[in-house]
Amino acid sequence: MSPPRHVLITGMSGLIGGLVRRSLSSRCTVRALNRSPIDGVDTVRADLNDLDAIPPAFDGIDTVVHLAAYLGDDPSGHLSTNITGTYHVFEAARAAGVRRVVYASSGAVAAGYEADEPYRALVEARWDDVPAGRAPITTDDPIRPNGLYAATKAFGEALARDYADSHGLSMICLRIGRVLPGDRPRDPREAAVYLSHRDAVQAVERCIDAPEDLRFAILFAVSANRGRYRDLEHARRTIGFVPQDGADWPP
């Protein structure tokens, strides 16, 4: 797929949204769908829960990067934003004839594996307890969400599969690792699932620029961390994502 000229980003006021906006602005026309205005960006102000209010944001858009999500403690927030809101974004994209949606899923969809060895040893940086030749978790393995947020992200992946199959949209689900404001891990678990700022931007841009015939994919996005247990080979083969950074613990 040649680089799209018109990209809509939901959740641009968040950390990843801001990083992606700054990178894309030099080569694309970028629009935000956000509840609050974004300085210097064409912003359609609307709530994702209002399907009647969001369609103007999708006019003339090639690619949607859906980053908006609720991460708090209120279950109703997860249901309204991460389930209903995600459905509304996908449906508005379909109705507008958008070519591709890049859906920000989460590595938390597989974080339940951290309760088991050797993954627990990896996220605790118990290097002597990690067996040689261990196989990473891949996107072919069963999901193991570690909470309601993760479960809603798994729902988004399933819905993306349906929109690819039933409506012909190109849907790429990116299981994003831990992106931190300070861009450095603060504990061994963060070091295992860390995704640097520049690797996060690279992963999203690789999804945007992936071949046009890529109909559906679920991909992990983490940096090249010593404690990494999530597969990166599939992302390398599918979109050419090769992390430039990595974390160790102790740092």
Region annotations inferred by a language model:
Residues 4-27:
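N-terminal Rossmann NAD(P)H-binding glycine-rich loop of SDR-like oxidoreductase domains
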Residues 147, 157-182:
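Conserved beta-loop-beta element that borders a ligand/cofactor-binding pocket
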Residues 88-146:
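Conserved Rossmann-fold NAD(P)-dependent oxidoreductase catalytic core, especially the SDR/UDP-sugar
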Residues 45-84, 92:
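NAD(P)H-binding glycine-rich loop region in Rossmannoid oxidoreductase-like domains
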Residues 165, 175-183, 194-216, 224:
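Alpha-helical substrate-binding/gating segment
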Residues 216-242:
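Conserved C-terminal active-site "lid" loop/helix of NAD(P)H-dependent oxidoreductases
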Residues 32-37, 48:
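N-terminal Rossmann-fold cofactor-binding loop
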Residues 49, 77-88, 96, 151-154, ...:
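Glycine-rich NAD(P)-binding loop of the Rossmann-fold in SDR/ketoreductase-type enzymes
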